[in-house]
């Protein structure tokens, strides 16, 4: 009989999706954004102030898929890794809320729309 122990995982790793959650990747806040609103133009997110190169908005279904709630985002200031096809990773903080019903991560891009980004990415909560 073998006495080899079976490795165990901490509970926080068991409650997160392995490899990330596939989400629609969109952009907002860029010059000429047809869906822009006055709060975004002022740099105000639903949870925290918006910062170029750092802020993202997530839909409620995206938050749920990552095991988060709106109140957790307000109190914890969570960051996510956005894994792009081809190997790139964007590190962003959840500062805003996107209104759509689908799983979506919306990059705050006040410097302009980036046409090089794909339409989908895998999103994981940073430890």
What are these regions (language model features)?
Residues 2-127:
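Secreted/periplasmic proteins
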């Amino acid at each position: 009989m073998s006495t080899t122990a079976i490795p165990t995982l901490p509970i926080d790793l068991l409650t997160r999706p392995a490899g990330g959650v596939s989400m629609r990747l969109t952009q907002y806040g860029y010059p000429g954004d047809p869906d822009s609103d006055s709060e975004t133009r002022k740099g105000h997110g639903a949870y925290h102030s918006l910062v170029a190169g750092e802020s993202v908005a997530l839909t409620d279904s995206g938050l749920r898929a990552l095991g988060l709630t709106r109140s957790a985002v307000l109190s914890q200031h969570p960051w996510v890794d956005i894994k792009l096809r081809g190997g790139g990773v964007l590190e962003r903080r959840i500062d805003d809320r996107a209104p759509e019903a689908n799983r979506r991560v919306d990059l705050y891009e006040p410097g302009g729309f980036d046409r090089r980004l794909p339409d989908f990415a895998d999103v994981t909560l940073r430890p």
